[in-house]
Structure formats: C-alpha cells, structure tokens
Amino acid sequence: MDEGIPHLQERQLLEHRDFIGLDYSSLYMCKPKRSMKRDDTKDTYKLPHRLIEKKRRDRINECIAQLKDLLPEHLKLTTLGHLEKAVVLELTLKHLKALTALTEQQHQKIIALQNGERSLKSPIQSDLDAFHSGFQTCAKEVLQYLSRFESWTPREPRCVQLINHLHAVATQFLPTPQLLTQQVPLSKGTGAPSAAGSAAAPCLERAGQKLEPLAYCVPVIQRTQPSAELAAENDTDTDSGYGGEAEARPDREKGKGAGASRVTIKQEPPGEDSPAPKRMKLDSRGGGSGGGPGGGAAAAAAALLGPDPAAAAALLRPDAALLSSLVAFGGGGGAPFPQPAAAAAPFCLPFCFLSPSAAAAYVQPFLDKSGLEKYLYPAAAAAPFPLLYPGIPAPAAAAAAAAAAAAAAAAFPCLSSVLSPPPEKAGAAAATLLPHEVAPLGAPHPQHPHGRTHLPFAGPREPGNPESSAQEDPSQPGKEAP
C-alpha cells in the first residue's frame, strides 16, 4: 500500500549563503496592513473633520445666543447696535462678577445671622434692599412678558422709554448715592427727574429734623457763581464757534466792578439782505466848526433838512451816491419841506449843477463843449441854478440851491472857486431862469431859448436830424458829436 502513494519531495533547506546576490523584487511591494488602511482612508478622513468643526462652532454660537437672551436688559442697553460675540461674553462676565459679589454679601449676612450678630445694616436699609430686589424681579417679568406675547424688542422706542421709566423709579429708592448718578443720562427727556426731585425734598426735610441723616438722601449741589458770570462765560458745548466771544469780553471786563455784564451775540443779516453800510464822519473837513467849507455845508444841510440826519449825511458824503441823492429828496414821508397832502409835489434838484467850464473837462471825451452848453445848460447860467415846481416857495428853493452848492464845495474842494461865481453873474442867471410867477417884480423876464423851463435836460429835437438826437441823449455817452 505504501508503494502506491507517491512520496513528497523533501524540502530543501536553504542556507543564508544561498540568498546572497538574489533580487527579491516582490518583497518591496509588500506593505504593512496599518499603512495600507491609512492611505486608503486619507480622502475620507477630511469630511468627518469638517463636520466635527462645524458642529463645534454651532455649539459655541448656540451657547452665545443663549447667553445673549439671558443677559439683563440694562446691560444690553449699554451698547449700541448689534451685540457681537465678544461683547456678549464680556457682558456675561460682568454680570457673573456682580452676581458673585451679591452672593458673597448674602453669604456673609447669613453667617452673621447664624452667629447671632446684629445686622450689618439698619432696618430701613434692609427694607430698601428687599424692595429693590423685588422691583427688579417684577420689571424683568414685565419685559419678558412684553417680549414674548407683544413681540417687543429692546431697541424699540416704547421699550426703551419703559425701561428708562422703571429704572428712574427704582433709582429713587436705591441705597447708595453712587447709583443715583446713573439716573441722569437714562431718564433724560422723561418726567423722572422731576419725580426724583419731588421725592428727595421731603427726604431732605426729614434728614434735617433728625440728627443722623438717611443714607439714601443726597443733598442738591448748587452753583455759588453768579448767574451773570455764568452767562458771560464761553459755552464749550457748542462747536459752532459763533457764541459771540469777541463781543462778550469787553462787556465782561467793564461789568466786573458793577456786578453785571451784558453779552452781545453776533447776528446774521435777516434773509439775503446785506448789512447797512457804515456812516461817514460828518466833521471830516470842517472839524465841527462852521468856519471851513465842511462846517458850512453841515450847517446848510442841517438848516435845510431839519432833524433828518440821514439826509444830511447823504448830502455830505463825498462818493458816487452824492449825485443820486441830490437828484430827488422828496415825494414821501422824508420830504424836506412839509406840505399838505393835496399840494405835495416832488422837489427835484438838477443833475448837472456844475458850470459848463468845470464840467467840460470831465465830459469832453464823450460830449462836445458846445453840445453840453446847448442841451444841458443854458449859456447865460454860470452858477448852479434852482429848479422850481408849483407848490415850492422861492426862499425854500434858494435855500436848497445854496445847500447843494455848499455840499458840492465840501465834496469837491478843487471846484469851490468854480462853484462860487461873482454876484453879478449869479443875479443874471437867477433873472434868466426864474419863472414869471416867482421872479422879482421889477426884473424883466426874457424868453427861455428852448421854451422849456421845467426840463433842462431836454432840448429841441429835429425830426430829420439824427445827430441832434444823438447829442441830446445823455444816456449814450459813447457817441461823439462830429
């Protein structure tokens, strides 16, 4: 039987020297099982790690949101805008510290009561603490009810007003004066300060009656500085810089001895109106005396215009407004000569009150001298002439002409010799220009060369002569006469 079974070949034992020089490439392909598993799950490992990190962040955000909801409302109102995570953590830490201090204080009270010692505070103080704690609990419950059922948010104006009112009422009974100072910024704009003042008044009276004042009564601090000095000080709360500092300093220095000062505040002109110009000095040339030309002009203007200083200043003002002010005075409430309302007529002075010889030097580039004498001034007049209208007596017109001549002499000293002609020429000019109703009885009245006594500016215009119309129009000075 044994012969029919083939015998297995005997295993040949290999020694170490048989392996030398052989290359076993298949051995390099073999890897350990642990490293093979790590390589295969390398891509699948990142996904669970991301999920774990997301879950961790979600848990952190959820805890911060719960802390935000558990924070008291007065801590939430200390910040503006959205509460960040860091702000929520800071407020939570602050609240925990306050609770820890309160817990430690209550623990000390309990120990003191167990040892049989007297209370650290007076009975009134203990009652106030109990009342304050109950008030906070009730206020918190009210806010939670409004937030849940009425959908109120802490940022709504009505919720802020309610919180301020509750806080103001609670601060009236606070035990320490340090917490009383928090009432001012929170209860501004409500009726809490007046209520606090009314509640503190009887408290101060009771403290004055007793020898030992109460701890929750705070005396009112009053300013000892006078109200006038307070009004004169610069207001540093305003940043406009328009408090009238330059005007207030001289008044304050003058009023220190008398005990009163007046503040002058700079004001803007109303609307778009420009401020009124400053008046010129009336005694610039005459020195206030009637000896010089300026003094004579001032006396003549004062005699003419009476109590109207503005018209007198306009007469003596040596600028471009002099001529425009001399063209027409009257016609209204400021008429120099009071007349009845029915007979009131405008009193006009001529525009060209200079003699032709003096005016020709100024208007020579625009008008010819002959044209000037022909159309603007009669040839016989060598002095300023008055213009008379019905309703104005001759003495008044003569006084007005004298005032105009004096004003012109004061404004233009170089022309004083021209404006003061000899008496015979002045008499001839007056006889030439005076109408028959006001002329002297013995003086002859010659016919006016142009036939118009009330309009010295208008001359005869020929319909077919364009040159005469160009010369007699003083509004076109650019056209020269041939």
Curated annotation (Swiss-Prot):
Compartments where found: Nucleus
Provide the cross-link position: Glycyl lysine isopeptide (Lys-Gly) (interchain with G-Cter in SUMO2).
K31, K121, K210, K266
- The annotated regions of Basic and acidic residues compositional bias extend over 246-256
Tell me the Pfam families matching this sequence. Hairy_orange (PF07527), HLH (PF00010)
* UniProt xrefs under SMART domains: HLH, ORANGE
Q: Where is the signal peptide?
A: none
Composition-biased stretches, type Gly residues, lie in: 285-297
Could you say what the effect of mutating P384R is?
Answer: Affects sleep duration; abolishes inhibition of CLOCK-BMAL1 and NPAS2/BMAL1 transactivation activities
This protein's major location comes to: nucleus
CDD domains registered for this protein in UniProt: bHLH-O_DEC2 (cd19750)
Residue ranges, annotated region (Disordered): 228-298, 438-482
Q: Under the GO molecular function aspect, what terms does this record hold?
A: bHLH transcription factor binding; DNA-binding transcription factor activity, RNA polymerase II-specific; DNA-binding transcription repressor activity, RNA polymerase II-specific; E-box binding; histone deacetylase binding; MRF binding; protein heterodimerization activity; protein homodimerization activity
Functional description taken from the UniProt entry: Transcriptional repressor involved in the regulation of the circadian rhythm by negatively regulating the activity of the clock genes and clock-controlled genes. Acts as the negative limb of a novel autoregulatory feedback loop (DEC loop) which differs from the one formed by the PER and CRY transcriptional repressors (PER/CRY loop). Both these loops are interlocked as it represses the expression of PER1 and in turn is repressed by PER1/2 and CRY1/2.
Q: How does it assemble?
A: Homodimer. Heterodimer with BHLHE40/DEC1. Interacts with CIART and BMAL1. Interacts with RXRA. Interacts with NR0B2 and HNF1A.
Protein name, UniProt field: Class E basic helix-loop-helix protein 41
Gene name?
A: BHLHE41
